[in-house]
Amino acid sequence: MSDNAQLTGLSDRFRGFYPVVIDVETAGFNAKTDALLEIAAVTLKMDADGWLTPDETLHFHVEPFEGAILQPEALAFNGIDPHNPLRGAVSEYDALHAIFKMVRKGMKESNCNRAIMVAHNATFDHSFMMAAAERASLKRNPFHPFVTFDTAALSGLALGQTVLAKACIAAGMPFDSTQAHSALYDTEQTALLFCEIVNRWKRLGGWPVPPLAAEDATPQDGE
């Protein structure tokens, strides 16, 4: 591999992690008891010059799992009617199986060894996706069990804003508040925001960084 490829490859940029932007809409705040109602995923790619851009997208309305709690306040907030047949909702298994398949394909093509969730206030989205994957008994979950890239934190650092809409505007991106709290729209905007932050850091000279003195001393995942 050439030096230039080493500097611009997705796997080298994030230490073997494959970033995947996720957003969920739910019927509450408890990932174990409240329904997952909508999920979207956007994968990312790097061009030959090392600039990050969105790649593939998947979006699903999701059927509440058996016994799931539907909090009225949450439904009023996101405007979702879980029982509307026009939603075309699928099971948690079908939604996550398709997303995981897309992610594993992208990991292989990018020479990455583990997917990492990118999300705005990522702990929330991560907890719901992981709980749904466990309920669906999906064994080949490509995502790291606890490491995430949180665009709320990154936006606070890079842009001085932590709310998604305000962070997008601060980054010079449009944000349509009438489409907010749609998993698809929020995921697409979060993907663009993450790409802008990563690319801005590169434009400012923050990437690439000098190589570590002793790569064999690099801590392993979770250390």
Curated annotation (Swiss-Prot):
Query: Assembly and interactions?
Result: Homodimer.
Q: Which GO terms describe its molecular function?
A: 3'-5' exonuclease activity; magnesium ion binding; nucleic acid binding; RNA exonuclease activity, producing 5'-phosphomonoesters
Q: What class of enzyme is it?
A: hydrolase
Its annotated function is as follows: Trims short 3' overhangs of a variety of RNA species, leaving a one or two nucleotide 3' overhang. Responsible for the end-turnover of tRNA: specifically removes the terminal AMP residue from uncharged tRNA (tRNA-C-C-A). Also appears to be involved in tRNA biosynthesis.
Recorded hits in Pfam families, A to Z, give: RNase_T
Active-site residues are H181
Cofactors needed by this protein, per the record, are: Mg(2+)
Binding of Mg(2+) 2 occurs at: D23, E25, H181, D186
Boundaries of every Exonuclease domain copy: 20-194
Q: What protein name is recorded for this chain? A: Ribonuclease T
The record's listing under PANTHER family reads: DNA POLYMERASE III SUBUNIT EPSILON, RIBONUCLEASE T
Annotated site residue numbers, Important for substrate binding and specificity: F29, F77, F124, F146
Task: Tell me which residues bind Mg(2+) 1.
Answer: D23
Q: Note how many cofactor molecules are bound and how.
A: Binds two Mg(2+) per subunit. The active form of the enzyme binds two Mg(2+) ions in its active site. The first Mg(2+) forms only one salt bridge with the protein.
Q: Mind telling me which SMART domains this protein's record contains?
A: EXOIII
Q: Which GO terms describe its biological process?
A: DNA replication proofreading; tRNA processing
Q: Which family does it belong to?
A: Belongs to the RNase T family.
The domain of life is: Bacteria
What's the Enzyme Commission number for this chain? 3.1.13.-
